[in-house]
Amino acid sequence: MLAKRIIPCLDVRDGQVVKGVQFRNHEIIGDIVPLAKRYADEGADELVFYDITASSDGRVVDKSWVSRVAEVIDIPFCVAGGIKSLEDAAQILSFGADKISINSPALADPTLITRLADRFGVQCIVVGIDTWFDAETGKYHVNQYTGDETRTRVTQWETLDWVEEVQKRGAGEIVLNMMNQDGVRNGYDLQQLAKVRAVCHVPLIASGGAGTMEHFLEAFRDANVDGALAASVFHKQIINIGELKAYLAAQGVEIRVC
């Protein structure tokens, strides 16, 4: 069995790490490189960097910090933000990123997933899905351009359908960003994760809602996700990664202990 992964997420805007609640009202957390190094030193398995306004601004992720991050950490990292071409992806990978993640650009042009997978291999290609639960209809809908709350829009895709579509097109991994839970630290949406897990045959990463060590355990044990991504609990030092991993290992979760 592959070890479960603990993945700090760093949302980047204007060259700094920020964090919001339900993708709104972002506060500045700090500089990118020192935070990346801190998480690597604490025992993170991987890092994810989202340039959150790149797609809504119509630009590609700012690459100036990618090589600086690669110089100070020795764990895999993934970069996302406005990647719309093979050239964009090649540049980011050449600067030292191990994976690239696409979200809004994949919704705009689903063939991008296949072209990237064919060129760089499925192991490099992550698709991020920003999913919102509509309590009135009981359905999960995919959102686009979520980095800017004034431009966020609901797409025609229901989440489970899009999960199946991106796999057919070559996604090697899926990060499910559960917008209702984002930043509120009440736990991952286990019901939604279970529904997605049933149709997801590539590695699935849970994102949105971690507030306690138990929340990570629930995601691994009850929803059988491959990795758990979190931001505010790590940024605000509510949870230490080394202590989290020791706790999970004690609960019988297969994990790479620091």
Curated annotation (Swiss-Prot):
Catalyzed chemical reaction(s): 5-[(5-phospho-1-deoxy-D-ribulos-1-ylimino)methylamino]-1-(5-phospho-beta-D-ribosyl)imidazole-4-carboxamide + L-glutamine = D-erythro-1-(imidazol-4-yl)glycerol 3-phosphate + 5-amino-1-(5-phospho-beta-D-ribosyl)imidazole-4-carboxamide + L-glutamate + H(+)
Subcellular location: Cytoplasm
Keyword Heme set for record: no
CDD domains: HisF
Keywords: Amino-acid biosynthesis, Cytoplasm, Histidine biosynthesis, Lyase
GO cellular component: cytoplasm
Gene Ontology biological process: L-histidine biosynthetic process
Residues annotated as the enzyme's active site: 11, 130
Main location: cytoplasm
Pathway: Amino-acid biosynthesis; L-histidine biosynthesis; L-histidine from 5-phospho-alpha-D-ribose 1-diphosphate: step 5/9
Lineage: superkingdom: Bacteria
EC numbers on record: 4.3.2.10
Assembly and interaction partners: Heterodimer of HisH and HisF.
Family statement: Belongs to the HisA/HisF family.
Function statement: IGPS catalyzes the conversion of PRFAR and glutamine to IGP, AICAR and glutamate. The HisF subunit catalyzes the cyclization activity that produces IGP and AICAR from PRFAR using the ammonia provided by the HisH subunit.
Name of the molecule in the record: Imidazole glycerol phosphate synthase subunit HisF
Species lineage: Bacteria, Pseudomonadati, Pseudomonadota, Gammaproteobacteria, Enterobacterales
Gene name for this UniProt entry: hisF
